[in-house]
């Protein structure tokens, strides 16, 4: 044997000591010699650790605690006893960052030398904040055993792949859950312990169901207890995913397994994966399928499919982004660089500790720019601390040694050392010596010429190098001079601006320094009191623009998250200006104590005037040795960002307050400034609590180094992590190309005109194992949570938005939301997506967890979003991203005035936000009505963007069915309509596909906007309009051109198809008689229909803005369409029929409620009746049947208070008698029988003059149903549009006109092969019978009140009919009034041949049957 390794004989002496020497600790990994098999030796260490040893835990400043430490049986965590934390007294091996030997930690440094034997001491650094567990063992052998064993375990964890880590984590979580549930420690769980565990896991199951699963899992002679293996089987039964099972059925042709071909289709169509082969799918089956029988047959069952989707392959984060994938050869100024502020501090800015460990932590966390504040120390040794405060001090030498050790452990990209130099020239030379001696070759000392200062080097060129950022002597100083004067105005040390000593040294001014620090601390305390009284959240630093206006801000209401910063920039119309010393000058309305203001400006002190004079010529002495170490990162003072930079090798530092002023006043110039050189942003000096500001506005302006306080975990640090995780966490993220070249205004409403935007469609499907809030008072014994999900987009101000789902009551284990959220993003390259889970509470909401990631890091398809810091908690979503062209605007309506959120506030809010606002007026009113949205329904949200043009999916396959080709060009923009007729802003959103829904619809919303009806193809003509100088819309064949789409499954006809009356030419003519004014807007062919959100995800396209109509179109009601993202093809195929006539995804997944659209047809009011009557019948195309279409032979229903969505017709002139229903007999005589999709009659204005009021099905009485009998079979029909209902023949006394005949003809006739009709999609005869029954909704209204209102309505209608019957031949028709709020769904009607009515009326006086309108 050769080499430095000892002989096997020598191993008998001090085996553990020898093993520790072999295990070389290099940056968190273990380097082993391939010549040695160390398994038995390591096992001895593991055995000794599992047996446990007594050691002393040091806390610093007090006596140590004697505890018994041991490694648990799964080797997953270190535990100790005794402890008041009970089962929580543990440190996970996964959380350990480093194990160091000897007295190296800051805690050991507090004890005098000689207190402990260094060979018996070691420290364990763990957690996100690098907390240290400092232990003293009884002997050096014990210390070596623990250090060796822990390093070995850490090495194994670092080497395992992500899949093995996820499976190991799950196994450990199951074992830990089992142990914690085993209260009596007998190794098994009783039914009582299981019920307690289910409550802890937020599972709300009936006891009988739990007992049944318990009996099924209890397989060992049914002893009434569950062992660990039985518990795993029980948990597996309990956690079977219905959503994944339905998803699997879709792609397996309704089988309970997926073969390789089906799995390949799923990965290609849904997950948008390229290059998927059958061999790779077979490998997935082999890897994830737990059942040996399925594995041998090459099948993936539900368990294997669940394992795959919950593996890293199903995570929302792109696995390629775990590694560096961006171009790293661009100049440094083209990258965002993660930076730390006052890196050495572990707490606040005034009195906390300074530790060298913080440098090790932030560098290993990916930070590439650290700050070192250098001051003169005793004995000629420079020290590091926060100047003029009471923070502790550490040696500059120790800091540099730590940086040298940990700088390039995680990656080799350059580290920038930001030195804030306050030392004398003598100690500056000492600093330069330490930097040169310790860093050595890592220090970039390459000889570069100032002539090359036009371009910065790239991160790739500077790999493994440390750059010193600091002041540099000017070129006009002699090279022989060892020192020189430089400006001190570029200092980024904020607090010394108020505290810098003018005369004397620190010893003579010690009292003044302490007073300044105490005054700052006092201001912090008083500010906290003001926050508590004036606002529940912290203030934020903000500035006013010169005009005094806020301008465009981002979110004012941030979320109160656990452990996050708190604050808001605007409350109740007040702007809190975050500068203590400048509140009076800014005109703040909050009255602060005078002591906070005094002294900061130094106006009352004798030195205040001299200080102001000194600032005009603030200079300092700089050593030549230290100056020569600065190459590419020279610190300079910047007074005007519009001036051309003299060199790119310089860095300008701005406080957040100054940077905000620049952002508000000169955003485009600031962006250009950051293209030429580096800039660094640091927190305000008044963030003495080490809170963080929002970094996103500065990233929007291209600022490279946005320094944050890494010791303050919270929202802002989470945004920072998400930003830099997009490139492997290397600390460098490439800026978008538009930020590196060209100029744009990041604060404008359309920052990049002409460029494609992204539409993000997120379907929040379900959640898994969501825990109780961490700060819950009752802990695991608290109530089962009521979760909802909030999604936030953080980017440019125009992109910042948030949406949220409804609340699911009493289910945190597997809640199902099935809701679709849509976002528009102008610049996705810098946008972040933030998922938050909240627990709804009557008095607020509690934070459960979050996950933030870059927009570019999201994977499409069905993905799991694992909450940060939680082992099993996740939400299941579907992600779809499309390209959007055209302008985007918010659709506003009357409901939006009540339900939309507060006006966005300042982007600079450094806090998670404030508690949610009180319910709006409309929400409080609606809660008191019978049909009000309940707690389980979706809260009010802002409107979805309303699109002018279509979408184009960025995916290749699988989405071709779900898109609408964009139009040929931008359409004229119409003003937003507000009022009762417009929908709620949260209810309208762009539609990416048009697909008919089945007759089963929801009773949730009544949409009223008519869509363009079918019309004949007119000759190509260009509509002209002089209104406001609008350009004519393109017509002719070119106007109907659509971008080609790829079909994935079903073949489609590539020829243009008429849709909503659009002919081949696609030309539209404006309706004769309509006025050319601002209210009349042209319709466009490329207009994307706007849909209305309902609970079950049914969408109804509304009429595009404007007054243009197809030639001679009779205004039929639109068909019901579904959203591609809200109702994907896979859900449409879940019904046994297998056709498109299936319910939408959320109907099948989350709700049995149905939606009916009662879009009322416009009968041409305001149009020329002669023009309508003269339209030739033969030119009218067929009208598709629709469950939502009302019979157009009846006039519209009057608007009611309880249903403001219906269009108000009270302002219209009365309808003449010629618009009464006409007989269908002449036209029906020669027509073949066709099964209708469904018809629903509406009571007209003349029939029901009294405003109808809302009533749910649960309130109907027997009097509300008028039975009629079908001829032959005498089948009972409740006269509500059920199958079997017959139509009465109009008597001879009813006048006929062309308009009514056209409307009747469109209602009953349907052209064969018309693909726009829902009935043409199914086989012949389908849908005639067997439709679903009524869906009844409970209500709190009394039946007696309903009868009284129905009686009044009936009497009023009878009076109206008597008046109408005066001009008729024969007795008036006897009809019922509309009961208040009656609702019904005409699932499937029948159009039989005319037959005599069997009602009370005689044949001669029979009129058209008016069915009861049942609506919410």
Curated annotation (Swiss-Prot):
Residues 740-869 form the C2 domain. InterPro entries: C2_dom, C2_domain_sf, EF-hand-dom_pair, EF_Hand_1_Ca_BS, EF_hand_dom, PH-like_dom_sf, PH_domain, PI-PLC_fam. The modification Phosphoserine is found at residues 487, 491, 595, 605. The keyword Chaperone does not apply. Substrate binds at residues 469, 471, 653, 680. Its EC number is 3.1.4.11. Residues 581-592 have a biased composition (Basic residues). It is found in: Cytoplasm; Cell membrane. The active site is at 341, 385. GO terms for molecular function: calcium ion binding; phosphatidylinositol-4,5-bisphosphate phospholipase C activity. Its main location: cytoplasm. The keyword Nuclease does not apply. Ca(2+) 3 binds at residues 784, 786, 810. Ca(2+) 4 binds at residues 839-841. Residues 535-620, 905-1109, 1121-1222, 1315-1405 are annotated as: Disordered. Residues 326-471 form the PI-PLC X-box domain. The production of the second messenger molecules diacylglycerol (DAG) and inositol 1,4,5-trisphosphate (IP3) is mediated by activated phosphatidylinositol-specific phospholipase C enzymes. This phospholipase activity is very sensitive to calcium. May be important for formation and maintenance of the neuronal network in the postnatal brain. This is 1-phosphatidylinositol 4,5-bisphosphate phosphodiesterase eta-2.
């Amino acid at each position: 044997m050769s080499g430095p390794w000892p002989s096997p004989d020598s191993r008998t002496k001090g085996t553990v000591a020898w093993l520790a020497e072999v295990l070389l600790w290099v940056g968190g990994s273990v380097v082993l010699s391939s010549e040695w098999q160390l398994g038995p030796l390591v096992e001895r260490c593991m055995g000794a650790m599992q047996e446990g040893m007594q050691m002393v835990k040091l806390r610093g400043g007090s006596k140590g605690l004697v505890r018994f430490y041991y490694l648990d049986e799964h080797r997953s965590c270190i535990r100790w006893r005794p402890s008041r934390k009970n089962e929580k007294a543990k440190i996970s091996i996964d959380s350990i960052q480093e194990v160091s030997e000897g007295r190296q930690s800051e805690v050991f440094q507090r004890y005098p030398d000689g207190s402990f034997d260094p060979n018996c001491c070691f420290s364990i650094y763990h957690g996100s904040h690098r907390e240290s567990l400092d232990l003293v063992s009884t002997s050096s052998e014990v210390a070596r055993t623990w250090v060796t064993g822990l390093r070995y375990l850490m090495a194994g964890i670092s080497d395992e792949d992500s899949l093995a880590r996820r499976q190991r984590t799950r196994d450990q979580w199951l074992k830990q859950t089992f142990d914690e549930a085993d209260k009596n420690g007998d190794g098994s769980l009783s039914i009582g312990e299981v019920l307690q565990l289910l409550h802890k896991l937020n599972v709300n199951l009936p006891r009988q169901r739990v007992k049944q699963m318990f009996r099924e899992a209890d397989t060992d002679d049914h002893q009434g207890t569950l062992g660990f293996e039985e518990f795993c089987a029980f948990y597996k039964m309990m956690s079977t995913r219905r959503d994944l099972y339905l998803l699997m059925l879709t792609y397996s042709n309704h089988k309970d397994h997926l073969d390789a071909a089906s799995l390949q289709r799923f990965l290609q169509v849904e997950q948008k994966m390229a290059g998927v082969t059958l061999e790779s799918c077979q490998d997935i089956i082999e890897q994830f399928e737990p059942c040996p029988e399925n594995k041998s047959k090459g099948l993936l069952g539900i368990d294997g499919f669940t394992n795959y989707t919950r593996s890293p392959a199903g995570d929302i984060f792109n696995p390629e982004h775990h590694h560096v994938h961006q171009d790293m050869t661009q100049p440094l100024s083209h990258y965002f660089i993660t930076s730390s502020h006052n890196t050495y501090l572990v707490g606040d800015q005034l009195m906390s500790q300074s530790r060298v460990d913080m440098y090790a932590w932030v560098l290993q966390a990916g930070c590439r720019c650290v700050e070192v504040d250098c001051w003169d120390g005793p004995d000629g040794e420079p020290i590091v601390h926060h100047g003029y405060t009471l923070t502790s001090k550490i040696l500059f030498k120790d800091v540099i040694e730590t940086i040298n050790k940990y700088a390039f452990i995680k990656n080799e990209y350059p580290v920038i050392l930001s030195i804030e130099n306050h030392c004398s020239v003598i100690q500056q030379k000492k600093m330069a010596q330490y930097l040169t001696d310790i860093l050595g070759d890592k220090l970039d000392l390459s000889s570069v010429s100032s002539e090359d200062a036009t371009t910065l080097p790239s991160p790739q060129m500077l790999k493994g190098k440390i750059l010193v950022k600091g002041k540099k002597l000017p070129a006009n100083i002699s090279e022989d001079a060892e020192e020189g004067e430089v400006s001190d105005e570029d200092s980024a040390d904020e607090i010394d601006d108020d505290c810098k000593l003018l005369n004397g040294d620190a010893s003579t001014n010690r009292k003044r320094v302490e007073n300044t620090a105490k005054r700052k601390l006092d201001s912090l305390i008083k500010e906290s009191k003001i926050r508590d009284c004036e606002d529940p959240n912290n203030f934020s630093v903000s500035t006013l623009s010169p005009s005094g206006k806020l301008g465009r801000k981002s979110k004012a209401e941030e979320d109160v998250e656990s452990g996050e910063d708190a604050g808001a920039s605007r409350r109740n119309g007040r702007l809190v200006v975050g500068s203590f010393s400048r509140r009076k000058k800014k005109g703040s309305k909050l009255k602060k104590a005078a002591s906070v203001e005094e002294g900061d400006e130094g106006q009352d002190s004798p030195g205040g005037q001299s200080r102001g004079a000194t600032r005009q010529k603030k200079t300092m002495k700089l050593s030549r040795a230290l100056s020569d170490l600065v190459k590419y990162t020279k610190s300079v003072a910047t007074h005007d960002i519009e001036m051309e930079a003299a060199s790119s090798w310089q860095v300008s530092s701005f406080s957040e307050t100054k940077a905000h002023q620049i952002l508000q006043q000169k955003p485009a110039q600031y962006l250009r400034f950051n293209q030429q050189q580096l800039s660094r942003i640091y927190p305000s000096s008044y963030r003495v609590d080490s809170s963080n500001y929002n970094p996103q506005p500065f990233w929007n302006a291209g600022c490279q180094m946005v320094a944050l306080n890494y010791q303050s975990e919270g929202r802002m640090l989470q945004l920072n992590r998400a930003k830099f995780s997009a490139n492997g966490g290397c600390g460098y993220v490439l800026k978008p190309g538009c930020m590196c070249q060209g100029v744009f205004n990041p604060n404008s409403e359309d920052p990049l005109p002409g460029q494609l935007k992204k539409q993000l469609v997120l379907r929040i499907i379900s959640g898994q194992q969501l825990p109780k809030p961490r700060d819950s008072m009752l802990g695991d014994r608290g109530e089962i949570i009521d979760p909802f999900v909030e999604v936030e987009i953080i980017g440019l101000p125009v992109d910042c938005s948030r949406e949220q789902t409804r609340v699911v009551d009493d289910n945190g284990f597997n809640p199902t939301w099935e809701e679709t959220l849509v976002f528009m993003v102008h610049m996705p390259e810098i946008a972040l997506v933030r998922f938050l889970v909240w627990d709804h509470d009557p008095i607020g909401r509690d934070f459960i967890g979050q996950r933030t990631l870059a927009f570019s890091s999201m994977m499409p398809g069905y993905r799991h979003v694992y909450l940060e810091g939680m082992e099993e908690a996740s939400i299941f979503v579907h992600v779809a991203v499309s390209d959007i062209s055209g302008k985007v605007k918010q659709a506003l309506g009357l409901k939006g005035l009540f339900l939309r959120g507060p006006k966005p506030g300042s982007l600079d809010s450094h806090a998670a936000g404030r508690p949610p606002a009180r319910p709006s007026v409309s929400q409080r009113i609606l809660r008191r009505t019978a049909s009000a949205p309940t707690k389980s329904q979706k809260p009010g949200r802002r409107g979805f963007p309303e699109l002018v043009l279509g979408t184009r999916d960025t995916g290749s396959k699988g989405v071709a069915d779900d898109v609408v080709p964009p139009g040929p060009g931008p359409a004229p923009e119409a003003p937003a309509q507000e009022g009762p007729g417009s929908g709620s802003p949260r209810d309208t959103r762009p539609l990416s596909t048009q697909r008919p829904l089945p007759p089963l619809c929801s009773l949730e919303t009544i949409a009223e906007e008519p869509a363009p009806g079918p019309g004949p193809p007119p000759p190509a003509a260009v509509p002209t309009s002089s209104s406001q100088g609008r350009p004519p819309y393109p017509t002719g064949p070119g106007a109907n051109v659509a971008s080609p789409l790829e079909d994935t499954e079903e073949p489609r006809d590539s020829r243009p198809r008429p849709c909503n009356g659009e002919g081949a030419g696609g030309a539209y003519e404006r309706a004769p008689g309509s006025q050319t004014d601002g209210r009349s807007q042209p319709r466009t062919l490329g207009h994307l229909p706007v849909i209305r959100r309902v609970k079950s995800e049914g969408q109804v396209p509304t009429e595009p803005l404007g007054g243009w109509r197809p030639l001679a179109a009779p205004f039929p009601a639109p068909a019901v369409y579904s959203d591609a993202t809200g109702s994907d093809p896979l859900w449409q195929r879940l019904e046994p029929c297998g056709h498109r006539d299936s319910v939408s995804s959320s109907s099948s997944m989350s709700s049995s409620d149905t939606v009916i659209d009662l879009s009322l047809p416009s009968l041409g009011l305001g149009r020329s009746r002669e023009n309508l009557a003269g339209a030739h019948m033969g030119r009218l195309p067929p009208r598709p049947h629709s469950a939502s279409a009302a019979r157009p032979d009846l006039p519209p229903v009057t608007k009611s208070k309880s249903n403001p969505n219906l269009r108000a017709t009270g302002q219209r002139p009365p309808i003449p008698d010629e618009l009464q229903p006409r007989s269908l007999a002449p036209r029906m005589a020669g027509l073949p029988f066709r099964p209708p999709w469904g018809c629903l009659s509406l009571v007209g204005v003349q029939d029901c003059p009294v405003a109808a009021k809302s009533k749910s099905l649960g309130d109907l009485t027997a009097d509300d149903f008028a039975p009629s009998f079908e001829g032959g079979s005498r089948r009972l029909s409740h006269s509500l549009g059920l199958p079997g209902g017959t139509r009465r023949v109009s008597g001879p006394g009813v006048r006929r006109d062309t308009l009514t005949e056209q409307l009747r003809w469109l209602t009953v006739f349907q052209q064969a092969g018309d693909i726009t009709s829902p009935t043409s999609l199914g086989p012949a005869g389908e849908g005639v019978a067997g439709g679903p029954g009524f869906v009844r909704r409970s209500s709190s209204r009394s039946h007696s009140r309903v009868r009284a209102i129905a009686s009044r309505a009936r009497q009023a209608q009878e009076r109206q009919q008597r008046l109408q019957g005066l001009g008729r031949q024969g007795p008036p028709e006897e009809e019922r009034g509309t009961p208040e709020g009656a609702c019904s769904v005409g699932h499937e009607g029948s159009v039989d041949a005319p037959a005599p009515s069997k009602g009370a009326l005689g044949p001669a006086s029979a009129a058209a049957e008016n069915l009861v309108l049942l609506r919410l």
